[in-house]
Amino acid sequence: MKKYPKIGIRPTIDGRQGGVRESLEDKTMNLAKAVAELISSNLKNGDGSPVECVIADSTIGRVAESAACAEKFEREGVGATITVTSCWCYGSETMDMHPHWPKAVWGFNGTERPGAVYLAAVLAGHAQKGLPAFGIYGHDVQDLDDNTIPADVAEKLLRFARAAMAVANMRGKSYLSFGSVCMGIAGSIVDPDFFQEYLGIRNESVDETEILRRMEEGIYDHEEYAKAMAWTEKYCKPNEGEDFKNRPEKRKTREEKDADWEFIVKMTIIMRDLMVGNPKLLEMGFKEEAIGHNAIAAGFQGQRQWTDWKPNGDFSEALLNTTFDWNGIREAYVLATENDACNGVAMLFGHLLSGCGQMFSDIRTYWSPEAVKRVTGKELTGMAKNGIIHLINSGATTLDATGESHNEAGEPCMKPNWEMTEADVEACLKATTWYPADRDYFRGGGFSSNFLSKGGMPVTMMRLNLVKGLGPVLQLAEGWTVDIDPEIHQVLNMRTDPTWPTTWFVPRLCDKPAFRDVYSVMNNWGANHGAISYGHIGQDLITLASMLRIPVCMHNVEDDKIFRPASWNAFGMDKEGSDYRACSTYGPIYK
């Protein structure tokens, strides 16, 4: 069973024995238990198991008890802490001093004991010591015997916990590059300093020829391969599309296409094994290959040295990013096409926060209402009336993005793996056509997934960029997938590559300059690619970015919904500027 980090709950208390401490013991510990129950009943790990909380063995009133708590948390694999109290405590004696753990403090809003006073005092201590902490203070006063968690407090506790678990899950893992720089794309010039200092992730790299070596030497699970081919024959090959993109002289024969299917299935198994290892290989005598690279994310270069010669990685990328394969429903992997590691990191953020498979897309085209009318003779309507952005790429878009899963209200959605059903799986596969690759671009052949995302799904488009002299910055745009007139779609889609998956996206507009219209969102995007996650997760992304000291340069989240460490308030009243100043002052966590 996979091991996950845990969240440590620290119940702090007034250390004065002889009446004061004794009167607060039950109340304080009950608050800690309530927080643990809130988190474990609402948040899940990647395999669907509840996020586990560890509570200190006793309340914490003096520094020796803080040390004992820290020791226990180290043993238990804690990756973040939440301190809770209903009273005054001794700030620097009871605070969490671990340099790498994200920290939050909930000070109970009650009149009998000054929990809010401790909250303010300990947050001042965190600021003074350079250990940022999130402050949580309920809007309304509660009675002393009320151990319920108000909705506003619960929202912040869960937002903190989601982001903190993402930080903890990344630490100590690897990003695996298959190959190197793809077609001069800057995002695939992997920066090891960024990964190490900001994420706690090491960089691993294998030449793409390692995939061929394992194929030729039979270093893969042959039983799984047979199972995978049977599954592919049942669910994918029947949906093979017409080879209409290739000129007759460039079309592969039926035998060559069948060989491509076999090749890309083996390729998928081998790429997964390289990422996370496979105990079956140990049984086969391949001890080194069985280990894998401990990769939480990866990227495949593909173009051009591979795709000019061998079947492309589209099938492998799409399927690994999906919440299922021939082994059934499982957690989606994170695999960036073209080894765009910057986009791979954004995909990883989205996956860790949402639990869903991620889309990898070119932010390809802004279609204004006027341009659509000119080329189609028809008008965009409904949510698309102000213009649309075409998200499309040959490779690593999860098949979950078909929108063929449905929520309880019957609406199209993308689900985390623990909510997926066999009916969802079959619907996603049925909606996906596998077209032979365009051999003008992919000379080695292969197959590209094609589908049209259902409209009406809330999604968040995001991107991490590296800027010389500044460092990493994150941008995001919350919005929706949209349905457009099928005749409009047909015309627009045929103007690009109709063998690839398409998603029509509209951002939520507001009065911020980058979001005044749909064109401005496209015009302010920082790179050619974007990662798209199901759900409006902008608030969570902003919280996560602050933990990692990555400023957010563009977003359409309302200011009153932004949750960052309390010390960010000391860097000025404008939230964007204070974020940049705070991130610059504190610097990356692991430097």
UniProtKB/Swiss-Prot annotation:
Recorded GO CC terms: cytoplasm
Reactions catalysed, as given in the entry: L-fucose = L-fuculose
Known EC number: 5.3.1.25
One of the Pfam families matching this protein, by short name: Fucose_iso_C
Domain of life: Bacteria
Keywords: Carbohydrate metabolism, Cytoplasm, Fucose metabolism, Isomerase, Manganese, Metal-binding
InterPro entries reported for this sequence: Fuc/Ara_isomerase_C, Fuc_iso_dom3_sf, Fuc_isomerase_C, Fucose_iso_dom1_sf, Fucose_iso_N1, Fucose_isomerase, Fucose_isomerase_dom2_sf, Fucose_isomerase_N/cen_sf
Location(s) in or outside the cell: Cytoplasm
Residues annotated as transmembrane: none
Binding site for Mn(2+): E338, D362, H529
An example Gene Ontology molecular-function term: manganese ion binding
Enzyme class: isomerase
Active site residues of this protein: E338, D362
A Gene Ontology biological process term: D-arabinose catabolic process
Pathway: Carbohydrate degradation; L-fucose degradation; L-lactaldehyde and glycerone phosphate from L-fucose: step 1/3
Swiss-Prot/TrEMBL cofactor(s): Mn(2+)
Signal peptide residues on this chain, from the entry's feature table: none
Function description: Converts the aldose L-fucose into the corresponding ketose L-fuculose.
Family: Belongs to the L-fucose isomerase family.
Record protein name field: L-fucose isomerase
